[in-house]
């Protein structure tokens, strides 16, 4: 390779690294785990979603859209909202999406405390394409839609700050590993548990 071409490539690489660092500096400070469990450069092409004070629901709408964009949704969640439960209910009970989720006890409790969400959740458990389990050891909220990964960004109090969406293979591998590790330690929730779900949140 000619020296000039090598210098150009190295300079271009440096500029790409600087631009990636600048664009991701704020989002990565809200990454719920520290250090970031993969090379941050894997997120150079990620979609960055930041909570907008003028449209507080924009982030939620993007999450709903992402979850609806594929045939297979896997994930781990430390928080839920009735609108997300309704979305999953429509995707599974009234659709053919395969859903596998690991929730924290507190996330399950929020679901059960909302009458409509609790009913929809119970109906989802009856579907053969739905697998839900509960574990205390879920560190953050991550969704895997087919081969796309969505990462929720939160502050130290767990308040949502935005999210990242990426198709990067390294991030996908990390997300699948996180999901599988959490599921291995989780307690399955079955239709037979529908009358005793409260026991799983204590």
Please report, for each region that a protein language model flagged, where it lies by residue.
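Basic, amphipathic "hinge/linker" alpha-helix immediately C-terminal to the N-terminal HTH DNA-binding motif
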Residues: 1-17
């Amino acid at each position: 390779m000619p020296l000039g071409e090598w210098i150009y490539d190295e300079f271009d690489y440096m500029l790409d690294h600087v631009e990636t660092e600048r664009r991701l500096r704020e989002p990565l400070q809200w990454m719920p785990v520290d250090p970031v469990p993969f090379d941050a450069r894997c997120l150079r092409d990620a979609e960055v979603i930041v909570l907008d004070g003028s449209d507080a629901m924009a982030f939620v709408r993007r999450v709903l859209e992402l979850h609806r964009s594929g045939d297979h949704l896997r994930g781990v969640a430390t928080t839920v909202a009735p609108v997300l439960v309704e979305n999953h209910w429509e995707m599974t009970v009234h659709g053919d999406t395969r859903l596998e989720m690991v929730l924290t006890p507190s996330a399950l409790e929020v679901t059960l405390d909302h009458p409509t969400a609790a009913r929809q959740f119970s109906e989802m458990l009856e579907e053969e394409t739905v697998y839900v389990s509960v574990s205390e050891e879920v560190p953050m909220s991550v969704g895997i839609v087919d081969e796309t990964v969505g990462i929720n960004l939160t502050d130290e109090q767990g308040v949502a700050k935005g999210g990242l969406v990426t198709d990067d293979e390294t991030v996908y591998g990390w997300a699948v590993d996180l999901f599988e590790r959490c599921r291995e330690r989780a307690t399955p929730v079955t239709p037979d548990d529908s009358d005793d779900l409260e026991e799983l949140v204590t």
